[in-house]
Amino acid sequence: MLDDNLAGRTISIFDEYLSYGPEAVEEVERMMNERGFSISLPKDDPHKAALVLFGEIFGAQISGTSYDSTMKLMIAVGVSLLVLMREKRESRAISFENIIMTKNDGTRLLPVIVNIDEPELHLHPYLQRALLAFCRSILNNKESFFLKLVQNLLGVDGLDGQLFVVTHSTDALVNDYRKIIRMYRDEKEMVRAACGSSFHFDSEIEKHLIMHFPEVKEALYSRCTILVEGETEYGSFGYFAKTLGVQFDYHGICLINARGESSISKIAELIRRFHIPAVCLYDRDVMGSRHHSSYVFYTDYICFEMDVVKSCLSHGKRKLLDDVIGD
């Protein structure tokens, strides 16, 4: 909900842009309709057109699909950003021209930093991702209509934008570890930052980590991680822990399926770079090819499944195995 001052400034911006002529009105109308709206703006009255546009974007939605409400939210956020940038242009606290960056080719860019705090408080996962992607598009000059608004209303060629998101949601995290900063406390309880852009891996490992990162990014919120090779370990470890009276969530333990022994060491190294302890479990058949190190363990027999079978047999639980096979 906009307060009266922000609403007035928003309408003023619409009014100014639509005053460029019928072509501008038609352009706005076309842009809105391409995004799922059904809107017709007066061509000969810019102020009335501005009021209609404002009501369409910021008014209560009585009917429509979830796509309609998503588009309304994203456009409303984009317009709000534009209002704030326009306020910076009109401010006398600092000359707007002193803020502008001019590239060697003469391109004029407005540096903008946008911070979004805890989007998960009000948005479900799909809206989190949609809104953040839309903001990135605006800041990277990929939204053609908003780019035109920036050019006409601010007198610059585009934006040089950065987006900072403070979140405890995996949905709001980008799927690229190089764009993540994790805050943590060191052994002296001092607050430190681990920045993914400062990590250096060779190109093949980097590609591998980026490909797997969407599956492991939950670990960034954990206190410790356990990495296992495959589906069997991943499916059973949680139940083993409960049998032992250990709740992973209570202790902040994240169980990760590395989907292959070759991925374990790579993912563990990435997690440790973010200053999160990582425990690794391998099948014994790869033990000879690996260096022994702390927090790396191997099954007693050639593979995890054999460990389970041997343990059941040694404890007289053959019937349990027969029942599993029967299922």
Residue ranges: model-predicted function:
Residues 101-104, 152-153, 210-215:
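Pre-Walker A adenine-sensing motif
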Residues 172-327:
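Acidic, divalent-metal-binding catalytic cores of TOPRIM
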Residues 130-131, 135:
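Conserved hydrophobic alpha-helix in the ABC-type ATPase nucleotide-binding domain
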